[in-house]
Amino acid sequence: MGSYLNPGSKGFQESLNSEIYVDKTGLIEKTNAVLNTRQKFICVSRPRRFGKSMAADMLAAYYDRGENSASLFSSLKIHYVSSYQQHLNQYDVIKVNMQEFLSMTHSMDEMLTMLQKYLVFDLTDHFQNVRFRDKNNLIQVMKDIYAKTNRSFVILIDEWDCLFREYQQNQDAQKKYLDFLRAWLKDKDYVALAYMTGILPIKKYGSHSALNMFTEYSMTCLLYTSPSPRDLSTS
């Protein structure tokens, strides 16, 4: 288990241990359905405090092949879905919170350098039996891993859009970031699922062409489904 590669289930376990927990594992059925398809790119845009990070923790706990997390899901809705066993703990997971890297750096170049350096550290430490062409190149490292192991990755990016608030007047920094995401994720066999969370829709940033592979789910009208009040009352 690394800091960013196969981070484990601790975050999701804390959600389950909380005084109030609402079962949102139905999301896993949706992500299972798009694994290794052209629809494997998902971006969820919601306001703060709407459970975006909890959902990312949940997906990490479910897919992470580094541990057996079956006991966490045994009483949740996803346990009774046909795809549950097929994908449980079957993927290497990369999970990053972009706000963390933004807070530790002072420029876009520095942020992207640190992000790639830290991910490469976890990857090369874990996959020690792989011969790497270039350990300074994240994309090539992941290509080499996939070529050797035929194991694809679930990539979870929390707060993907935080830099647009920090660099809202710096179009050059924004372009560098979008170009990096596109190069890292698009048309890569090593991606089984890419799941990003943010506050505002992708289109807010004028980035249709850069990230046009993503299907975006945003909240334009907040409503409860009919079972939700009942679920809340029994939580």
Give the label of every model feature segment.
Residues 1-226:
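Phosphate-binding site recognition
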Residues 224-235:
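Single conserved hydrophobic/aromatic residue that forms the stacking wall/gate
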